[in-house]
Amino acid sequence: ILGNDKDVEAAVYAAKKAFNIFSNFSKGDRLKLLENLLLVMEKRFEDLAKSMTKEMGAPIKFSRNSQADSGIGHLKGFIESLKKQPQREVISNGDILVREPIGVCALITPWNWPINQITLKVIPALAVGCTCILKPSEHTPLSAKIFSEIIEEAGYPPGVFNLINGDGPTVGTLLSKHKDVDM
């Protein structure tokens, strides 16, 4: 079933509402959620690999060794990067650089390398305290569905991550033009 304008409105509303709380999570709290996410992704590794074989026709060995594994590798890299990232930094001219979440992020991913693309967009947004609406390719929705289950099991609050299946001309366009989507 493809999403529509009502689904987009519901997801944007949920993400905007959740942003008010999630954007105030400490770096430590966000790291804990990312570490939980890693544990659940590792536990659901085979489900991710099988979903990409089913939805894309990739050989299972390739799905395991390259596709599903890339998502876990990216997640580990983002965890390490966040650990080193200062929230405030004095730059060379004396100004203070403050890093803060931008808001609601609408993330649209292609059919190829689905978990790779999802993790490269969703994880950095969650790491810095943004809320997300993911619209995966309508041709590869299975891995995104499993990823949404992983997010929920990892303990992210409701509304922080939202999944809408739909096509680009409908859901993609609505998300891209929505006044309450910040990025």
Give each language-model segment a name.
Residues 86-183:
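Rossmann-like NAD(P) dinucleotide-binding subdomain of oxidoreductase/dehydrogenase enzymes
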Residues 1-94:
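N-terminal Rossmann-like NAD(P)+-binding subdomain of aldehyde/semialdehyde dehydrogenases
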